[in-house]
């Protein structure tokens, strides 16, 4: 009986322990990296999703503009005093009317999105590049109020209700030359620097976000996606 009890209480043999250790080692080498990449994959996914949302918003504004102004022959008749840009007919998105199109004293409204004869989204504000960020913020659901987060310092703005850090990457305050970058808050710290985001940036280990440069009259907006640093 003592022998049977002893056999029933016996543990793993040395060979069995070695086999278990080897199996755990294989799992650590093959499976662990896949789990570690989940955050990176998630960041890359949301970045691509935001880029798609921006493209869709720009295309929507362009389509509505073409339907509104496409056959009216209004090019060159009006100048908006806020932006100072020549040869553009401007009205508030979804609020276009004859009064908007005939008044040369028409003023832009903060926080609104406007249509132009070029068909690309623009802001009616007169404070330059930093404020034109509102044009895109107003079209996206990022937990950012377009009338509140209008200027972004060198460290970017990280609204508490948003999952994004937003940078003003404009080199000057010319309304024709404004740009911004959106970086996920969950991205690696190495990616949270606006110097890595421009129209000339190459996607690299330090980039994880979306770069947007506003339209310049007939030119379409520039939208670039960076995911290698996510």
Named regions from a protein language model:
Residues 18-33:
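Alpha-helical hydrophobic helix detector
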Residues 56-74:
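Alpha-helix exit/C-cap motif
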Residues 36:
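N-terminal Rossmann-like NAD(P) cofactor-binding subdomain of oxidoreductases
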Residues 40-51:
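Membrane-proximal amphipathic alpha-helices
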Residues 1-10:
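N-terminal leader/signal peptides at the extreme start of proteins
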Residues 73-84:
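Extended amphipathic alpha-helical segments with heptad-repeat/coiled-coil character used for oligomerization
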Residues 82-230:
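Intrinsically disordered, low-complexity regions enriched in Pro/Ser/Thr/Gly and acidic residues
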């Amino acid at each position: 009986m003592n022998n049977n009890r002893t056999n029933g209480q016996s543990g793993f043999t040395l060979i069995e322990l070695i086999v278990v250790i080897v199996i755990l080692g294989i799992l650590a080498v093959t499976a662990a990296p896949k789990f570690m990449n989940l955050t990176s994959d998630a960041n890359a996914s949301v970045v691509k999703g935001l880029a798609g949302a921006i493209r869709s918003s720009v295309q929507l504004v362009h389509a509505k503009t073409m339907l509104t102004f496409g056959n009216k022959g209004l090019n060159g008749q009006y100048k908006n005093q806020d932006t100072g840009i020549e040869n553009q007919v401007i009205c508030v998105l979804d609020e276009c009317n004859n009064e908007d199109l005939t008044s040369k004293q028409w003023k832009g409204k903060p926080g609104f999105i406007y249509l132009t004869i070029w068909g690309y989204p623009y802001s009616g504000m007169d404070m330059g590049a930093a404020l034109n960020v509102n044009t895109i913020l107003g079209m996206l659901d990022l937990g950012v109020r377009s009338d509140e987060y209008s200027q972004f310092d060198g460290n970017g703005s990280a609204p508490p209700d948003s999952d994004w850090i937003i940078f003003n990457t404009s080199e000057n305050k010319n309304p024709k030359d404004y740009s911004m970058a959106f970086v996920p808050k969950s991205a690696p710290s190495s990616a949270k620097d606006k110097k890595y985001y421009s129209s000339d940036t190459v996607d690299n280990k330090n980039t994880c976000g979306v770069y947007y440069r506003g339209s310049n009259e007939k030119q379409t907006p520039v939208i670039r996606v960076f995911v290698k640093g996510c």
